Amino acid sequence: GVVPSKASFSMHSILVNHFLRGAWYPKGGAGEIAFHTIPVIRKAGGNVLGNAPVQRILLDSQGKACGVSVKKGQGLVNIFAPVIISDAGIFNTYERLLPAEARALPEIQSQLRMATHGEGGFTVFVGLNGSREELGLEPTNYFIYAGDDLDEIMNRYLASSREEAAKNIPLLFVTCPSAKDPTWETRHPGKSTLAIVTFAKYEWFEEWKDKQVSKRGDDYEELKKTFVDTIMQAVFKLYPRIEDRIEYISGGTPLTNQHYIASPRGEIYGIDHNIARLQAEAIATVRAQTAVPNLYLTGQDLCLGGFVGALQGALICGSAVLKRNLYADVARLKKRTQATDSKK
């Protein structure tokens, strides 16, 4: 999520190595991850609550985390537990969910000083009338750049006014989820989807942050439409057959991310994973264990951005909570699975 001059070589190497081995996609779409995870949680005695946003982390008289307060309708419900794990991100966890006295702890302030917000994201979701074959879509991720000096084009873009930026977007990530899913055509014959992502500054949309979702006014919608139109003109060059086959299109700004996934400034990869974040001191400081007893961090902010980065954060956090090396468990599981497969 950063320009090359601010990117860690080691992190980039991990990413390249990941894709050199081939990518993967869950059959049935991303929702299958939650669908198959929830029963495991419930089987272990846990539960999963929807429409129950956490309002604050509860501390006991000794300053230890002992539960969370969640919103239910117009009221609040306190849920108590011996261990509290937060995947809300460093800024949300420390600045929004913890009481002031815990937030003021030197260790927490030290972590906050080392963290910076990642850049906001702008996403376009497209529904298409036509199959993958009819529209020439591919199970491929495309990165489209407006030039070969990525630092220069991105810095100029992020320094420009919102009106200028909306017409001159230098970087796009284009993916076709429906083409990647081998079950898609059976479930949704003759239909396809695209998702396009780029970066956008939170400040470009900040004046509408207090407006109600879907009621932010004509100026906001016009700015959003300009971004969408510019993005789609580039996508039409990649997939020309889709231009007159669009049935649905929706743009999401940093405010959209702020509303639906509670990212403080519309960021999609959590905190900024730049070189400073990956220095030894920062890695040693931002750990799963927090200065508040019984409170742990997990997810992107603990490790790296993206799904696999968040998954690594979960393994690190789980190891800390259980006081057990889960990476060793995974290695043993892999070895056992390979041995079983070889006998088939």
Regions found by a protein language model. Give the residues of each.
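Beta-rich nucleic-acid/ligand-interaction surfaces
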Residues: 47, 52-66, 70, 251-264
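Active-site/ligand-binding neighborhood in enzyme catalytic cores
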Residues: 1-44, 51, 259-277
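Hydrophobic, well-ordered secondary-structure elements that form the walls
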Residues: 85, 126, 196, 235, ...
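A glycine-rich dinucleotide-binding beta-alpha-beta segment and adjacent secondary-structure elements
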Residues: 1-4, 169-175, 237-304
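Active-site-proximal substrate-binding core of FAD-dependent oxidoreductases
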Residues: 59, 63, 323-344
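Mid-domain catalytic core of redox enzymes
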Residues: 25, 55-187
